[in-house]
Swiss-Prot record:
It comes from Legionella pneumophila subsp. pneumophila (strain Philadelphia 1 / ATCC 33152 / DSM 7513). GO terms for molecular function: phosphatidylserine decarboxylase activity. Belongs to the phosphatidylserine decarboxylase family. PSD-B subfamily. Prokaryotic type I sub-subfamily. The gene is psd. This is Phosphatidylserine decarboxylase proenzyme. It is found in: Cell membrane.
Length: 283
């Protein structure tokens, strides 16, 4: 725990938003020499498997961000026939039941649904006895996010906030981390009731985006997007791409009807998992 505190302490002191803006600038630079240097060093440092990428040649990407949100060959991530599939490549930080509206962040640390979604009590009440899974995407992982289940898009809320790292050490130290960081809460209707996918920002995450909106502009103000009427093609099928991170981060998946979700027993905190793998059955 002491090591975690030492690792995390500098994050309270550094200008996280300024560093993130600078990182975002360089990630979009198209100068061949600079972008190739950044991409090739990243591949070496994190041992990225480019054989899975739709475009295998690192030099073929226009900028670092294009490389980072690279598409994978479809055959590399076959979709299981499970009722609920994993929406990302990553690691399970925590998974289980929402207890009286509280989600487990790490041992001994909790945060509320209402804090996470920045919503009123009536909406949060729907998830009081729900189920959740927190999925951490490491730098080497595929950073596009897909649908875990067929769903109808309802609305989206951009919530400004801090930009702490979301690495495991930080989650063990910073209270209510996912409810403090910048995030995008996306609300859906499914055949078993409401579902929310929360895309959490972090240090040097240049942008969070969705397939229907593109990059969501960073702001100091909370912003809501209502798709109840103007969005025509609202049904997004299981496995379809719905968003991406330009660096970072974490996805928190919430289901309101907890009694209907039975998580795969092999899924434990710390488990690695890939897009398309079984996550839960609907009972």
């Amino acid at each position: 725990m002491f090591r975690d505190v030492l690792k995390t302490l500098p994050q309270y002191l550094i200008p996280k938003h300024g560093i993130t803006a600078l990182a975002g600038y360089f990630a979009d630079v198209k100068n061949p020499r600079l972008k190739n240097f950044l991409i090739q060093n990243f591949i070496r440092k994190f041992d990225v498997d480019m054989s899975e990428a739709l475009i295998e040649d690192p030099k073929s990407y226009d900028c670092f961000n294009d490389f980072f949100i690279r598409h994978l060959k479809p055959e590399c991530r076959p979709l299981s026939q499970s009722d609920v599939i994993c929406p990302v490549d990553g690691c399970i930080s925590e998974i289980g039941k929402i207890e009286r509206g509280q989600l487990l962040q790490a041992k001994g640390k909790y945060y509320s649904v209402q804090e996470l979604l920045a919503c009123d009590g009536q909406l949060a009440e729907q998830f009081v006895q729900g189920q959740f899974a927190t999925l951490y995407l490491s730098p080497k992982d595929y950073h596009r996010v897909h649908m875990p289940i067929d769903a109808e898009l309802v609305s989206m809320t951009y919530i400004p906030g801090a930009l702490f790292s979301v690495q495991p050490a930080t989650t063990r130290v910073v209270p209510k981390l996912f409810a403090r960081n910048e995030r995008l809460a996306i609300f859906f209707k499914t055949k078993i009731g409401p579902m929310v996918m929360v895309m959490v920002g972090a240090t040097i995450v240049g942008a969070i985006g969705t397939s229907w909106h593109g990059d969501v502009k960073r702001s100091k103000e909370l912003e809501r997007f209502d798709y109840s009427e103007q969005f025509l093609d609202k049904i997004i099928s299981q496995g379809s791409e719905m968003g991406y991170f330009k660096l970072g981060s974490t996805v928190v998946l919430l289901f309101a009807n907890g009694e209907k979700i039975q998580w795969d027993k092999e899924l434990l905190a710390g488990s690695k998992i890939q897009l398309g793998k079984p996550m839960a059955i609907i009972t």
